[in-house]
Structure formats: C-alpha cells, structure tokens
Amino acid sequence: MDILKSEILRKRQLVEDRNLLVENKKYFKRSELAKKEEEAYFERCGYRIQPKEEDQKPLTSSNPVLELELAEEKLPMTLSRQEVIRRLRERGEPIRLFGETDYDAFQRLRKIEILTPEVNKGLRNDLKAALDKIDQQYLNEIVGGQEPGEEDTQNDLKVHEENTTIEELEALGESLGKGDDHKDMDIITKFLKFLLGVWAKELNAREDYVKRSVQGKLNSATQKQTESYLRPLFRKLRKRNLPADIKESITDIIKFMLQREYVKANDAYLQMAIGNAPWPIGVTMVGIHARTGREKIFSKHVAHVLNDETQRKYIQGLKRLMTICQKHFPTDPSKCVEYNAL
C-alpha cells in the first residue's frame, strides 16, 4: 500500500514540476507530458532542441480579418446548444472538440458558417440541381454577352453521337438474348445513348424563347437528370458487371422497344421494377424446413426499384427513354402505351 501511495505522489509531483496544469483546468494532455519528458531527456544528454518554425510563428488563419472580428466581438450565444449541435452535424463537423466549451463550439460554428456557408449540401433534389445548372448557364450567357449574328449553341444539351440509325439498331436487336452477354450489353449501351442523343437534338432544336421558358427549362433539366441517372448503368455495362437478373430484364425491354412492341416492353419494365410477388415479412427459415414465403424470394419476384437508390434512379431513367422512344418511333396504337409524363 505504501508503494502505491508513493507512486501516486511521484506522479503528482512530476506533473507539478512540468507545469502542465493551468489554474482553471483540472486535466492535461498526455502528449504535453510526453513532450516535456522528451525535452528533459535531451537536456540530460546534452542536446539542445532547435525550435521549429511552426512553433515560432503564431498560428494564423487563412482569413486574418475574420479571426480579428471573431476575437473582438465576443457575442453572446444566440443559439441553443441543440441548434449548434444540429448545424455542426449538418456540415459534418464534430459537435465538441477536446476541452471545448459550449461557447467555443458556438464560435467555431460561426466561423464555419462565414467561411464555408455550404460545405455539405446533403440530400438535394436532383431535378432542382439540374434546373439551377440550366439557370446558371443562361446567367453566364447574359454576363458574357454574345456577338450579333452568332449562333447560340453554348446552352444546348450534350448530344451523344453514336453514328448509327434506328434501322441499324433494329437489325442488331435481332441478335439480342441469344446467349452472347457482352454483345447484348454493347447493343443496350448503344441504343440507350442513341435515345439520349435523339432527345437532346429535339430539345436543342427549340426556339430560344421556348428554351428560356419555365417548361423549357424543366424539359432540359429532365434530360440532364436522366443522363446523370443512367451513368451508373452505363458504367456497369462497360465493366461487364451488371447483375444477371437486371441484365436479362433490360435485354427484354430493349428487344421489345426495337421491335416497337411498347406494351410488351412496358410489361417487362413493370416485371423488373415491381415484380409480381410481395416480399415475405417475418421469419422465413425456421429449423430445417423453409416457410412458404421463402420460395418466392428469387430475382423475378423481387422489386429491383426497392433495392437501392442507384438502381431506382437508372430504372426511372430507362422508363423516360421508353417514353421518348415511343414518341419518336411510333407504331400501331394497339402496341403503344398512353404516356402523359412528357
């Protein structure tokens, strides 16, 4: 017991000798103690530690004016602690640093909001973001100016030039679903990019006043949004890692679209997106015997639109391209689906 007491006293005396405790604080950083012990060791060995440039120069912010303003105006806390925590979490910042008081956290939040007002935008509306991009393009055109007689093409949508025609694609569609997965993925990619190009050319051919109208901006934003939704699908097709069940369903959809069997294509789309069996709820495996709901869990009965957000987006983008395909390449009314979306 005496040995333990003497060790505690030795540790306490060591902390007091190193001057680690400030008057108003009851704790110290272990790194400071290690640094002091290292300095004492070098002094005993006869070495002299040269102070680093970082230690000589005071820490300055990238915005000294802001630091001066925050230091001079010590405003009282105008936000509750709960609101400060919420705003810090929205920006991905820690709610409290080591040794930080509530007021210090409030001051840190003020500094973050002034320097980086929108660091993390969080979950944003994709269509709203596309509309903002369209508005910014028009604003840049107004600010930059335009020479008289110059053709206004800088705000046109990007067109995917596939150097192919619908007749060539229809001929390629005859070989879909014959067992060559790599060829099927190439045809799917080519046809979807062809439809995106057809859609972009149609929107670019509009009059300028139509492009600048609210509905015109909405149509342009929808096309941009659809293109961004389909990028993960194009990436999977290019890397040949598209899941087999989704690949089979998309192959059927594209084949029916090339045959202009839009009702059958819509049925295949619903089969992929929604499925025809509910997902069993509750325990499906008890003991050695599976319950009846277990046998319904396989790819054809699963709603892929519910799997994750990425799949939901490119399935939605595929549905929009089905509408565009029927609009530009019509067939008999009995083989068409009534669309009011676009």
UniProtKB/Swiss-Prot annotation:
Main localization is: nucleus
Annotated localization = Nucleus speckle
The source's domain of life comes to Eukaryota
User: At which residues is N-acetylmethionine found?
Assistant: M1
Which Gene Ontology BP terms does the record give? generation of catalytic spliceosome for second transesterification step
Q: Which GO terms describe its cellular component?
A: nuclear speck; U2-type post-spliceosomal complex; U4/U6 x U5 tri-snRNP complex; U5 snRNP
**Mind telling me which InterPro entries this protein's record contains?**
Prp18 (IPR004098), PRP4-like (IPR014906), PRP4-like_sf (IPR036285), PRPF18 (IPR039979)
Which UniProt keywords are listed?
A: Acetylation, mRNA processing, mRNA splicing, Nucleus, Spliceosome
The UniProt function text for this chain reads: Participates in the second step of pre-mRNA splicing.
Q: How does it assemble?
A: Heterodimer with PPIH. Interacts with PRPF4 and with the spliceosome. Part of a complex containing U4/U6 snRNPs.
What is stated as this protein's family in its record?
A: Belongs to the PRP18 family.
**Name this polypeptide is given:** Pre-mRNA-splicing factor 18
Give the organism, scientific name.
Pongo abelii
The organism's lineage?
Answer: Eukaryota, Metazoa, Chordata, Craniata, Vertebrata
